[in-house]
């Protein structure tokens, strides 16, 4: 009897089954790495027959890319149901929630942003670009700035750049241990607030004057 046939199966709706496979894959990739995890491992952990992984995702690589996407695209709950309070408070809460997500999925997240992420292929790069755009949307939402029109593209560009700094700073926390979580939370919160409250208005004023912002 094959390993696939001995798996206990529960009857689930397709979306529930897909989510269950994703959750199992995320845990396995977080505990190991892309090369060390097989589709058989994932099928066993998810309680499904191996062909179902191909049915829902196409194969191990496609499943891994979806896991990467889940890790890199800032989840909606990070900015959902924020209190109707100040920009500072809302952004501090969002940063704290985001750190929770990264801490829970440390290894998978680090692999996704690292050079070993299946060769840093174009699909991973595409996911990173998508993640940057969605993160910019979430920052604007948390900062109560979704209606900004003037200088919007420049503002989004600065927020995307902040995202790159955020990833580098998070590696200092998770890998080097040079920053504690509270240090990182304060650094990330203060940095985005300075960008929105000081840098963006300065760039906007310079653009209105038709000149380059001073050094």
Could you say what each language-model-derived stretch is?
Residues 64-71, 112, 127:
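Alpha-helical DNA-contacting segments of helix-turn-helix folds
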Residues 20-28, 74, 93, 97:
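Pre-recognition alpha-helix immediately N-terminal to the DNA-recognition helix
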Residues 1-16, 202-215:
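N-terminal intrinsically disordered/low-complexity leader segments
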Residues 102-126, 137-140, 168-175, 204-205:
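Amphipathic alpha-helical segments used for helix-helix packing
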Residues 76, 122-146, 156-168, 183-186, ...:
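Amphipathic alpha-helical packing segments from all-alpha helical-bundle domains
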Residues 18, 39, 61, 65, ...:
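Short, structured helix-loop boundary elements
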Residues 20, 24, 28, 32-62, ...:
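Helix-turn-helix
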């Amino acid at each position: 009897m094959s390993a696939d046939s001995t798996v206990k199966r529960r009857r689930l709706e397709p979306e529930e089954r897909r989510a269950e496979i994703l959750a199992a894959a995320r845990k396995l990739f977080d505990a190991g790495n892309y090369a060390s995890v097989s589709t058989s491992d994932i099928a066993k952990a998810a309680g499904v027959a191996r062909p179902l992984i191909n049915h829902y995702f196409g194969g191990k690589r496609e499943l891994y890319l979806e896991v990467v996407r889940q890790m890199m695209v800032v989840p909606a709950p990070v900015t959902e149901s924020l209190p109707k309070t100040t920009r500072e408070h809302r952004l501090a809460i969002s940063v704290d929630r985001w750190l929770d997500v990264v801490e829970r999925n440390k290894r998978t997240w680090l692999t996704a942003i690292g050079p070993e992420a299946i060769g840093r292929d174009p699909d991973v790069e595409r996911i990173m670009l998508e993640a940057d755009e969605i993160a910019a949307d979430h920052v604007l939402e948390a900062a109560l700035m979704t209606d900004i029109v003037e200088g919007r593209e420049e503002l989004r560009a600065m927020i995307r750049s902040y995202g790159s700094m955020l990833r580098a700073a998070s590696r200092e926390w998770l890998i080097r241990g040079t920053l504690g979580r509270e240090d990182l939370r304060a650094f990330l919160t203060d940095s985005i607030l300075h960008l929105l409250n000081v840098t963006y208005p300065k760039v906007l004023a310079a653009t209105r004057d038709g000149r380059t912002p001073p050094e």
